[in-house]
Regions:
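Polytopic alpha-helical membrane proteins, predominantly small-molecule transporters/carriers
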Residues: 1-110
Length: 110
């Protein structure tokens, strides 16, 4: 199961890397960042294919998207100086809490 979560973490990493390149592509007019973005997204989805065998797709997708959103918000603040209201920050932490709860109780409740 550890290997599955490593694949999921890799998918989150590649999805975040691709998303962070979106502004750099300048509406897909810059070839190198666009190619890198495409490569990163393909890697993310490739890794997700290994996760779907072990984790229910709803749990996998909630984890992947939730952790991606949280990470992108932090990196957006660091690299692009994007700020969030305290309510948005609270919401991001609730997403992480939700991901933890969903993964903690998957398969234990019928």
């Amino acid at each position: 199961m550890i290997k599955t979560y490593l694949f999921l973490a890799g998918a989150v990493f590649f999805e975040v890397a691709g998303t962070m390149l979106l502004p750099v592509t300048q509406n897909f007019t810059k070839l190198v960042p666009t190619a890198a973005l495409t490569f990163f997204y393909l890697c993310a989805f490739y890794l997700l294919t290994f996760v779907t065998d072990k984790i229910p797709i709803a749990i996998m997708y909630a984890t992947w998207s939730g952790l991606g959103i949280f990470t992108i918000a932090i990196l957006g603040y660091v690299f692009f100086k994007q700020t969030l209201a305290w309510q948005a920050v609270l919401g991001l932490f609730l997403i992480v809490l939700g991901v933890i709860l969903v993964n903690s109780f998957t398969g234990k409740v019928s």
